[in-house]
């Protein structure tokens, strides 16, 4: 039986600090995002430092701190168009504090952001449970542990 074709993904990968490039190889980012996609997408992933992460979170969410991932979704159909902003120092700290590998944490946050870009949310408990279940399903298929366990 033939596997269904994966949705087309156009990816732009940007690093505010080139030192983060080695931690996040393009082929892995492509794999993680594609695994979470249900529709074609044009996604920019930007890895930022604390100052840029904090400024974006403050300006767009009125929260004056750097957060792990921000999703800016611009279009949902027929092609998802979105920016995923990950704050490297926050991601690194969380991975260390939670005893997870940095790779697994980046995979989780990129899957999480990709689901947001497709309309998933976690503001309401039922939606949060559905989104977490989908994240876990995708991450397990990629060979990672349940991030919520």
UniProtKB/Swiss-Prot annotation:
GO terms for biological process: rRNA processing. SUPFAM superfamilies: Metalloproteases ('zincins'), catalytic domain. Keywords: Cytoplasm, Endonuclease, Hydrolase, Metal-binding, Nuclease, Ribosome biogenesis, rRNA processing, Zinc. Gene3D superfamilies: Metalloproteases ('zincins'), catalytic domain. Binds 1 zinc ion. The keyword Repressor does not apply. Its cofactor is Zn(2+). GO terms for molecular function: metalloendopeptidase activity; RNA endonuclease activity; zinc ion binding. It is found in: Cytoplasm. InterPro entries: MetalPrtase_cat_dom_sf_prd (IPR023091), YbeY (IPR002036), YbeY_CS (IPR020549). GO terms for cellular component: cytoplasm. Zn(2+) binds at residues 112, 116, 122. Its EC number is 3.1.-.-. It holds the Pfam family YbeY. Belongs to the endoribonuclease YbeY family. Single strand-specific metallo-endoribonuclease involved in late-stage 70S ribosome quality control and in maturation of the 3' terminus of the 16S rRNA. This is Endoribonuclease YbeY. It comes from Methylibium petroleiphilum (strain ATCC BAA-1232 / LMG 22953 / PM1).
